[in-house]
Structures are given as structure tokens and as C-alpha cells.
């Protein structure tokens, strides 16, 4: 998907060549993703990823076979080869490392310009973008990543507001304001942004410190990070911490 995007942006034919090759490989060997994945928290599905890539390759090449794959996944309610349901009834997860169905849904809607396809996207976003004064918390484990992921897809949908019928830009701006410090604590969640930025993000190389069991002078675990990881987003609060 990223190579197809790069081709669309920069016109490098080699990017497109390898985007097609990787797509074909992934489609041919789908079971590798889940049969060979022994990590308990690892990705066990692949259809969303291939659909995401198919959408970009359709935009890059105009080859209808890519659109067919995307449409089949997005319009199916059944279980695919990997056990992953299609998205006929909508999207149920923010864009993340393990599920890119939202991205695929937006691509399909952009391509088809269909009101019903946009509805798959906006129905989900309507359920999340409910308040400009309340921090949106999808999950307390790293809530900020999910917050900004929903912001991103909400802003893309707003870009196509003539087709989607929705404009979430005000909501997204309010959510980003809270992340950057416009909240009851005055703290922001972005490292290196200002004096109220996080000083102790969990990042091994940025810490600049090492474990020192003999207390020979190495800074303790609670010391500020030795290197500023500018732009990094820390975990984030619960849904009520910024109230």
C-alpha cells in the first residue's frame, strides 16, 4: 500500500512494480499471516491489509481487479479465508496496526462516491465524534493513539464532505487541542512540544540511561530522558482524566 501511495505521489515506476509484486505475493500466500504467527497478540487476519493495498493499486493503475477485491471484502458479511469478517455492515475499529478496515472503507467510498459506502465510514465516526469537550477514549491502553487515528480518518472524511455529507473538522480540532494541552491538567501528550511535554516517555534509546544495580552513578530509572524524542505521542489518559 505504501509503495502504491509513493508511486501516486512521486511517479516512481519502481515503486509501482514492487507494490504489485508484494500485493501478488500477499494474496497468494495469505495463510502465512495467521498459520505461522505464534505471537499471541499478533495479526491473525490479512483481508483488510490486502483490501487496503488493492484500493491504492486501483488508484495507481486503474486495474479493475483491484477494485473487485476491495469491493468483495467491503461488501461481504461472511468469514474469509483468515476468519475475518467483511465490512458489509460497517467498520468497528479505528485505524491501527492490526486493522486497516477503516482505511479500506474510506478508499472504497472515495472511489465509488456511493452514499451507502460513505455511510459505512460515517456511521462509525458519528458514534465516536460525539463531544468537543470530552476527550475521546477508545481504550485506556494507549488511548492517544486511537484518538488521533480517529481524528485522521475523520479529517479525511471531512475532506470529502460533499460526498460523505459530514464535517468532523471542529471535533478533530478540539480533540487535538486537548492532546496538546488544552485540558484541565494543562499537560500535553506530545514529547518536545513545549515545557509541559512528557519528560519520561517509555522509550529505551531516548532514555539515555542504563540499569545500574550496583549504584555506581548511572542515573536512576526515574531520571528524565537524556534525549528528547521530539514528536512522540505518549500513551494518554482515560476518558475522565481531562475532565
Report each predicted region and the residues it spans.
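Acidic, serine/threonine- and proline-rich low-complexity regulatory regions
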Residues: 36-39, 86-90, 130-142, 159-161
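Aromatic (Trp/Tyr) and acidic
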Residues: 1-9, 47-72, 95-131, 140-243
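Catalytic cores of extracellular degradative/oxidative enzymes
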Residues: 1-88
Amino acid at each position: 500500500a505504501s509503495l502504491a501511495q509513493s508511486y501516486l505521489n512521486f511517479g516512481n515506476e519502481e515503486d509501482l512494480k514492487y507494490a504489485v509484486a508484494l500485493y501478488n505475493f500477499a494474496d497468494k500466500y495469505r495463510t502465512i499471516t495467521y498459520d505461522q504467527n505464534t505471537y499471541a497478540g499478533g495479526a491473525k487476519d490479512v483481508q483488510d491489509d490486502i483490501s487496503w493495498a488493492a484500493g491504492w493499486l486501483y488508484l495507481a493503475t486503474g486495474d479493475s481487479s483491484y477494485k473487485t477485491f476491495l469491493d468483495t471484502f467491503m461488501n461481504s458479511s461472511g468469514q474469509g479465508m483468515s476468519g475475518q469478517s467483511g465490512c458489509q455492515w460497517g467498520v468497528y475499529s479505528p485505524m491501527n496496526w492490526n486493522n486497516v478496515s477503516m482505511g479500506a472503507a474510506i478508499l472504497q467510498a472515495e472511489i465509488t462516491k456511493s452514499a451507502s459506502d460513505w455511510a459505512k465510514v460515517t456511521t462509525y465516526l458519528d458514534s465516536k465524534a460525539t463531544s468537543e469537550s470530552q476527550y475521546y477514549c477508545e481504550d485506556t491502553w494507549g488511548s492517544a493513539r486511537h484518538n488521533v487515528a480517529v481524528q485522521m480518518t475523520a479529517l479525511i472524511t471531512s475532506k470529502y464532505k460533499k460526498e460523505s455529507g459530514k464535517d468532523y473538522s471542529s471535533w478533530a480540532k478540539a480533540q487535538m487541542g486537548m492532546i496538546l494541552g488544552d485540558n484541565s491538567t494543562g499537560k500535553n501528550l506530545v514529547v518536545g512540544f513545549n515545557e509541559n511535554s512528557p519528560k519520561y516517555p517509555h522509550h529505551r534509546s531516548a532514555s539515555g540511561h542504563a540499569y545500574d544495580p550496583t549504584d555506581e552513578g548511572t542515573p536512576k530509572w526515574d531520571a528524565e530522558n537524556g534525549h528528547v524524542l521530539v514528536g512522540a505521542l505518549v500513551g494518554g489518559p482515560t476518558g475522565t482524566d481531562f475532565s
